[in-house]
Amino acid sequence: MVNIPKTKNTYCKNKECKKHTLHKVTQYKKGKDSLAAQGKRRYDRKQSGYGGQTKPVFHKKAKTTKKIVLRLQCQSCKHFSQRPIKRCKHFEIGGDKKGKGTSLF
């Protein structure tokens, strides 16, 4: 289980900052797929009418986890940067810290 603190002091690349500042940490989430994207328009056009499924449906999923991407927002200039971390099954931001010699559960 990966537990990340809610704030992190790290370098800000923005041209106004260019120094170490406090950053607010959130988890990156994928946005909603656009209906206006060219591939989606083409797919919908091909699917319409008679004839069933026209393109292959992908079934051979290889991975069981996704790489976690942290979204860091600078507290002074509000600039966002993203930082990937390793794959993990359980991820939490700002959870209880594990004490010495104690179990978390």
Curated annotation (Swiss-Prot):
Annotated spans, Disordered: 28-57
Pfam families: Ribosomal_L44
Record's keyword terms, sorted: Ribonucleoprotein, Ribosomal protein
Xref: InterPro entries: Ribosomal_eL44, Ribosomal_LSU_eL42, Ribosomal_zn-bd
One BP term from GO: translation
GO terms, molecular function: structural constituent of ribosome
Keyword Signal: no
PROSITE patterns hit by this protein: RIBOSOMAL_L44E (PS01172)
Domain of life: Eukaryota
Gene Ontology cellular-component terms listed: cytosol; cytosolic large ribosomal subunit
Family statement drawn from the similarity comment of this UniProt entry: Belongs to the eukaryotic ribosomal protein eL42 family.
Listed name of the protein: Large ribosomal subunit protein eL42z/eL42y
Organism, as annotated: Arabidopsis thaliana
Gene name as annotated: RPL36AA
